[in-house]
């Protein structure tokens, strides 16, 4: 970076600040631009596609201050930490070099600026390891703060993958593991001091003498302290977030990342998903809450029924539903507005949005009170008429983006501001009024008020009228035909006009700061209201979707899973003639082996079973004519097959790792959905594993299971075990080929129709005909059927010990890292 002695004072200042923020791109304010130098300049030039120049032979690139947000978004999305260095004084007023300080460090997990955020949650997570993984994670934009612990690294990583975690901060020993496991995640290693003095940091942040009442463990204190220190470092503030909430696994159905992906629950690589189908919310808050519900279905029947009852109330009252949703469409993102208020970074437009949202609360409450099932919810919505009054009195309805130009604080709020604003905007009119007043007082009709650069404002009186000049006039200049005077009032008026712009800026900014302080007293109550409005939005949304798509209210049973004419909530939206199918499972039908050709709908059928279970437990109605559903503690899926190139794991290894997780973690109350397990290895190995796994799930776990497979040999299990049944997909053969009817019926697929599917896909006729010849030969010589018969007759050893694999057996069913 060159010899420091040869640098200008400004560049020395830059180097000193950069030394403190080595790991960040430093954007250094110079007038109307933010400049970057040296390596930072080369990076932003490349990422932002802007010109790279030089200053004192140092690479330099700059961005206009008014376009900062657009460029920041690109830098952060590209995985960079950015430090914003501002000028702390007016360059024209500075004595020597302008004072500059870093006012903000922006990382993927510490964004509060609306322009840089999507509507989704954006979590920053701190994590430590001491026998288990303990985490604290916060959405800085909404203030939500959670604590969660994990027994294994696999569980921790799984949670991170599905939970809108955009950044993880951790100790050195976890850094490498996380970067290897989730390469695209922004992970930052923290120095050891972040994890020290944590109890004092928590007390300081919340302004408490004691934190015993928070009921958090020592490890949770440690990780919270680190999180709060990091927030202070990036936001330059030590503002208290919401009190931490512990995410209790016992309250929610567990959905691992593979299940979330396989069932297409939320937006991801696969495109069409349940969230997009269900999400017709009116507010960003409601959309975020709906996504949380989908990822954390309820497990307590009482809580499910309470939510379902509210959904049903709206479902049965479409006029009320439409009215409430119309009101909600006028509610802004209060969670994020209130967080910006808490950090002192709220804008005038934010506060007007808050006011407009609060205006709607009384109307929403009145509407809800018309339905007896919603009266209690209406009572939980607190009105903030005092806040509305404060904002109505203080702010214009269409204020500027920032205070200081005189177009934010409403007229009548401050006499002093009004006076200076009147001078600034109406000085000519004021001078005319002053001139007319002086003419009336003196009787000098030709008296006029003028201005020049030497004397400023003056009163000019013709020579013939000088005798009428009052004593308080002070002579300043004698001309040939007139005399010029000033008065104390005119001098004060001049001083006001000359300083009016500066005064308007200072006073309006000061009043806006006072307003923010006054409103901050209401933040906790307003956050509770925001939470209630987001719940109202999510609940009424589920009712609207249920009416729109013809869903039915599910009943909850002790164990029977019966759904009449069940449909796949996502697929049916994109297929004009979707074929509905029944689901029927109980103790006598605990496991289904589902066979049928490719493209027949096996995978769609078993996936819709999982989707209906999830939808029911978030309190939603479900796509069916009738539904009786048990409450599941977890939904497991094992579907598809692909290599993981990034970790070097083969298809079969990944498949067996997922199978191992199911066999270890599933309980009698779980739902297991399997699709083509065993396809990643040889036919004999695949059938052996699939058979043994099916027996283990049936005998040792005893949960409800659907297993879609091309191994028709597995259908023989139904002759061995009373509770295993077979399903297949109807196919009609015609002269023109095969027609897949997508209707699920009891029975076994007589063949896979793979060659017919190949023909439909456009495989050349010669290849198709040769395939038919080979199939005839292989079918005649196969001894697999004979061997399966031996299996069925009881020659295969049964797994005897529940939840335990016999010692010495190949450790396919052990969870953990597989070398």
Curated annotation (Swiss-Prot):
Gene Ontology terms: cellular component: cytosol
Keyword DNA-binding belongs to the record: yes
Keywords: ATP-binding, DNA damage, DNA repair, DNA-binding, Nucleotide-binding
Amino-acid positions noted as binding ATP in the UniProt annotation, renumbered to this chain: 596-603
Family matches, as SUPFAM superfamilies: DNA repair protein MutS, domain I, DNA repair protein MutS, domain II, DNA repair protein MutS, domain III, P-loop containing nucleoside triphosphate hydrolases
InterPro entries: DNA_mismatch_repair_MutS, DNA_mismatch_repair_MutS-lik_N, DNA_mismatch_repair_MutS/MSH, DNA_mismatch_repair_MutS_C, DNA_mismatch_repair_MutS_clamp, DNA_mismatch_repair_MutS_core, DNA_mismatch_repair_MutS_N, DNA_mismatch_repair_MutS_sf
One Gene Ontology term from the biological process aspect of the record: mismatch repair
Stated role: This protein is involved in the repair of mismatches in DNA. It is possible that it carries out the mismatch recognition step. This protein has a weak ATPase activity.
Name of the protein this chain belongs to: DNA mismatch repair protein MutS
Organism: Thermosipho melanesiensis (strain DSM 12029 / CIP 104789 / BI429)
């Amino acid at each position: 970076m060159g010899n420091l002695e040869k640098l200008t004072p400004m560049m020395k200042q830059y180097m000193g600040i950069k030394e403190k923020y080595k790991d960040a791109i430093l954007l250094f304010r110079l007038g109307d631009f933010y400049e970057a130098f040296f390596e930072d300049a080369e990076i932003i030039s490349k990422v932002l596609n802007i010109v790279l120049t030089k200053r004192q032979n140092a690479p330099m690139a700059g961005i206009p201050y008014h376009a900062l947000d657009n460029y920041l978004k690109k830098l952060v999305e590209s995985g960079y930490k950015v430090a914003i260095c501002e000028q702390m004084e007016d360059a024209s007023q500075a004595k020597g070099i302008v004072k500059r300080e870093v006012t903000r460090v922006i990382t993927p997990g510490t964004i509060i600026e609306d322009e840089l955020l999507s509507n989704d949650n954006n979590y920053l997570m701190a994590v430590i390891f001491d026998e288990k993984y303990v985490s604290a994670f916060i959405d800085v934009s909404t203030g939500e703060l959670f604590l969660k612990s994990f027994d294994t690294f696999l569980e921790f990583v799984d949670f991170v993958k599905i939970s809108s975690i955009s950044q993880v901060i951790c100790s050195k020993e976890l850094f490498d593991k996380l970067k290897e496991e989730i390469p695209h995640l922004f992970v930052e290693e923290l120095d050891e001091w972040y994890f020290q003095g944590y109890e004092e940091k928590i007390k300081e942040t919340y302004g408490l003498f004691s934190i015993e009442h928070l009921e958090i463990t020592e490890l949770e204190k440690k990780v919270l302290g680190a999180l709060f220190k990091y927030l202070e470092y990036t936001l330059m503030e030590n503002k208290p977030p919401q009190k931490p909430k512990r995410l209790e696994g016992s309250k929610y159905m567990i959905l691992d990342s593979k299940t979330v992906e396989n069932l297409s629950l939320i937006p991801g690589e696969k495109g069409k998903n349940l969230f997009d189908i269900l999400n017709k919310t009116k507010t960003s808050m409601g959309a975020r809450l709906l996504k949380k519900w989908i990822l954390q279905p309820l497990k307590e029947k009482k809580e499910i029924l309470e939510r379902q009852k509210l959904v049903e109330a709206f479902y049965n009252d479409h006029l009320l539903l439409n009215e409430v949703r119309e009101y909600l469409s006028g509610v802004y993102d209060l969670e994020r507005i209130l967080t910006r208020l808490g950090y002192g970074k709220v804008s005038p437009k934010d506060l007007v949005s808050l006011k407009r949202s609060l205006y709607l609360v009384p109307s929403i409450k009145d509407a809800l009170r018309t339905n007896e099932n919603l009266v209690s919810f209406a009572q939980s919505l607190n009105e903030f008429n005092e806040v509305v009054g404060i904002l109505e009195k203080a702010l214009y309805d269409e204020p500027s983006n920032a205070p200081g130009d005189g177009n934010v604080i409403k007229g009548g709020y401050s006499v002093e501001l009004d006076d200076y604003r009147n001078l600034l905007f109406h000085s000519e009119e004021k001078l005319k009024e002053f001139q007319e007043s002086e003419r009336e007082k003196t009787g000098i009709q030709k008296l006029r008020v003028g201005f020049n650069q030497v004397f400023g404002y003056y009163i000019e009186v013709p020579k013939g009228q000088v005798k009428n000049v009052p004593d308080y006039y002070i002579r300043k200049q004698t001309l040939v035909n007139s005399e010029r005077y000033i008065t104390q009032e005119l001098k004060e008026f001049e001083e006001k006009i000359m300083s009016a712009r500066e005064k308007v800026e200072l006073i309006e900014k000061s009043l806006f700061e006072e307003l923010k302080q006054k409103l901050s007293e209401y933040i906790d109550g307003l956050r509770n209201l925001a939470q209630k409005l987001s719940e109202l939005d999510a609940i009424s949304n589920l009712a609207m979707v249920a009416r729109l798509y013809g869903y039915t209210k599910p009943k909850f049973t002790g164990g029977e899973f019966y759904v009449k004419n069940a449909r796949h909530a996502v697929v049916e939206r994109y297929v004009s003639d979707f074929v509905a199918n029944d689901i029927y499972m109980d103790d006598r039908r605990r496991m289904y082996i589902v066979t049928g050709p490719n493209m027949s709908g096996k995978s769609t059928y078993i996936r819709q079973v999982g989707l209906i279970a999830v939808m029911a437990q978030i309190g939603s109605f479900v796509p069916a004519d009738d539904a009786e559903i048990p409450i599941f503690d977890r939904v497991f899926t094992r579907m598809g097959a692909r290599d993981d190139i990034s970790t070097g794991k083969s298809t079969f290894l990944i498949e067996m790792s997922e199978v191992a997780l199911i066999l270890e973690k599933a309980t009698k109350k779980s739902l297991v959905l399997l699709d083509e397990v065993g396809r990643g290895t040889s036919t004999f190995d695949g059938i052996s594993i699939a058979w043994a796994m099916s027996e283990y799930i049936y005998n040792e776990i005893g949960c409800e299971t659907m297993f879609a497979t091309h191994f028709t040999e597995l259908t023989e299990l139904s002759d061995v075990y009373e509770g295993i049944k077979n399903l297949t997909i109807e196919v009609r053969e015609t002269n023109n080929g095969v027609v897949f009817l997508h209707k699920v019926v009891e029975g076994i697929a007589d063949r896979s129709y793979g060659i017919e599917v190949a023909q439909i896909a456009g495989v050349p006729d010669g290849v198709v005909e040769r395939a038919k010849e080979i199939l005839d030969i292989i079918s005649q010589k196969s001894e697999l059927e004979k061997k399966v018969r031996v299996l069925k007759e009881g020659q295969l050893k049964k797994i005897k010990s529940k939840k335990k694999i016999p010692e010495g057996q190949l450790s396919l069913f052990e969870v953990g890292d597989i070398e």
